[in-house]
A protein has these predicted regions:
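A short glycine-rich, Lys/Arg-flanked "PGG" loop and its adjoining helix->strand segment in the class I
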Residues: 307-322
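Conserved Class I S-adenosyl-L-methionine
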Residues: 365, 378-442
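Conserved alpha-helix/loop element of class I SAM-dependent methyltransferases that forms part
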Residues: 205-223, 238
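Conserved catalytic/acceptor-binding region of the Class I
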Residues: 322-391
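Conserved HGGG/HGGXW glycine-rich cap/lid loop of the alpha/beta-hydrolase fold
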Residues: 151-192, 205, 239, 303
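Catalytic active-site module of serine/aspartate enzymes centered on a nucleophile-bearing elbow/loop
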Residues: 95-138
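Class I SAM-dependent methyltransferase SAM/SAH-binding core
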Residues: 224-226, 232-284
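A short acidic, Gly/Pro-enriched loop at the edge of an enzyme's catalytic core
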Residues: 283-294
Length: 442
């Protein structure tokens, strides 16, 4: 029998459903890594599926005719979904008007009524025999197979998988949904953005980049460290172990969902006293001026007002302290090691082929200019590639999930054949380009 740590997501979900006595349920989610295994391997438990801002034609055939996709009506994500859905039968598509959805958008809070109405109208179609039946589950919380759950309401079970990086997650929708359905909201380190952040933060190729950043920041024993946008806390925990308690470490994030998971994971690893997690906005940090010797941030500046965030980071850094920032790089190509035709390889390795950046965010070499304009000196500029191989399946699945929906069927087949060949030879990897900068506050 597989250990819990080795369980696939679909096996974890199946154990959870058995524990709750649920044979069949409606599901709603975002990331394919959360729902694809269940849909393809255990389709009999899926009464219907609602996807938010995503579509992957590789996995949806088992739910044809009972699939709803909700997107905005503008922006690259909506266009990618439209292209991926083209020619696929049995899919209902609802577009939220005048809306561009990013991974960090507060979709359930900003479009509560439209989002709720779309879900309820779709779910109302599945009340005939054979759909998910009402289950008398008591309201409460628990954890099974590494997945946390919270139950609200009475009715047919509706399993709510994490909404990527959305701060509010499903909370604004729960009151209305739980009037008609037994909502089962899921979390934990095995699902959603937390699973990706944790896997990425343990990958050798990624940690080498972060380790290089810390070394260039010249962190010394006794210095106070702030991580802005700490997410699940995976890097804060890594730093706490690396420094063995020699530094006061604080993590701040605006996302309550990620902060809850960060505190839980730190407690599970016995690091709850080594790291302080705080709620706070990167554009208005809740700390006094000159509070930390080192202020760092990793792949957050793409999602904020970049210049305002840098100004805040400098403000809370002590004179002589260092500010260290990593941004995803949409202006650098991303090499992939597998035998593809030259034209196809050039297409998918081109700068900016995948990735997101907000209107005021920074995901290019302007990071170095911005850091200097923020008043930092002795700026070190470190463009780097983080590589992920077969030892990093969760990150590879995420990167592949961003790539494949932008390809046509012939290209997908070529990719899958080439990947299988490269994996058989043990040479497959994908890369994620970044810009890294370290500067000193005068």
């Amino acid at each position: 029998m597989a250990t819990e740590a080795a369980l696939a997501v679909e096996d974890r979900l199946h154990r959870l459903l058995r524990h709750l006595g649920v044979d069949q349920a409606h599901f709603a989610g975002w990331l394919a890594q959360d729902w694809s295994g269940l849909v393809t391997k255990c389709p009999q438990v899926v009464s219907s599926l609602i996807l938010v801002n995503t579509f992957d034609r590789r996995f949806v055939e088992p739910v044809s005719g009972k699939l709803l996709v909700i997107t905005g009506d503008r922006g690259p994500a909506a266009e990618k979904v439209r292209n991926a859905m083209r020619g696929v039968p049995g899919v209902q598509h609802v577009e939220l008007s005048d809306y561009d959805i990013f991974p960090w958008s507060v979709i359930a809070g900003e479009r509560t009524r439209e989002f709720t109405d779309a879900m309820l109208e779709f779910l109302s179609r599945f009340t005939a025999p054979g759909s998910a039946n009402s289950v008398p589950l008591p309201e409460g919380e628990g954890k099974v197979a590494g997945i946390s759950y919270r139950i609200r309401g009475v009715g047919p079970p509706l399993v709510l998988l994490p909404l990527f990086l959305t701060p509010s997650q499903w909370e604004p929708l729960i009151p209305a949904l739980s009037e008609r359905y037994c909502t089962i909201t899921l979390g934990g380190a095995a699902l959603g953005a937390v699973a990706i952040l944790e896997a990425r933060g343990h990958a050798i190729g990624y940690l080498e980049m972060v380790r290089n950043l810390i070394e260039k920041a010249d962190l010394r024993s006794g210095e106070a460290v702030l991580e802005v946008g700490c997410g699940s806390g995976v890097l804060a925990r890594w730093l706490a172990r690396r420094t063995a308690g020699g530094n006061r470490i604080t993590g701040v994030d605006i996302n309550p969902y990620l902060l809850r998971e960060a505190k839980t994971l730190a407690r599970q690893e016995g690091l709850e006293t080594a790291i302080e997690f705080r709620d706070g906005n990167a554009e208005a940090l809740p700390f006094a001026d000159n509070s930390f010797e080192v202020v760092m941030s990793v792949t957050v500046i793409e999602e904020t007002d970049a210049d305002q965030m840098l100004a805040e980071m400098v403000l809370v850094t002590k004179p002589g302290g260092r500010v260290a920032v990593i941004a995803r790089a949409l202006d650098i190509g991303s090499p992939k090691n597998l035998p593809l035709s030259a034209g196809f390889k050039a297409k998918i390795e081109a700068p900016g082929f995948t990735g997101d950046v907000s209107s005021r965010g920074c995901a290019d070499a302007s990071l170095y200019r911005r850091v200097q304009q923020a008043g930092l000196t002795q700026v070190k500029m470190l463009p780097q590639l983080a590589a992920f191989d077969q030892a990093d399946p969760t990150v590879l699945q995420f990167l592949e999930g961003a790539l494949l929906p932008k390809l046509n069927e012939e290209e997908v087949r070529e990719w899958q054949t080439a990947r299988a060949e490269a994996e058989a030879m043990g040479i497959f990897y994908m890369t994620w380009p970044h810009h890294c900068a370290v500067g000193t506050k005068p």
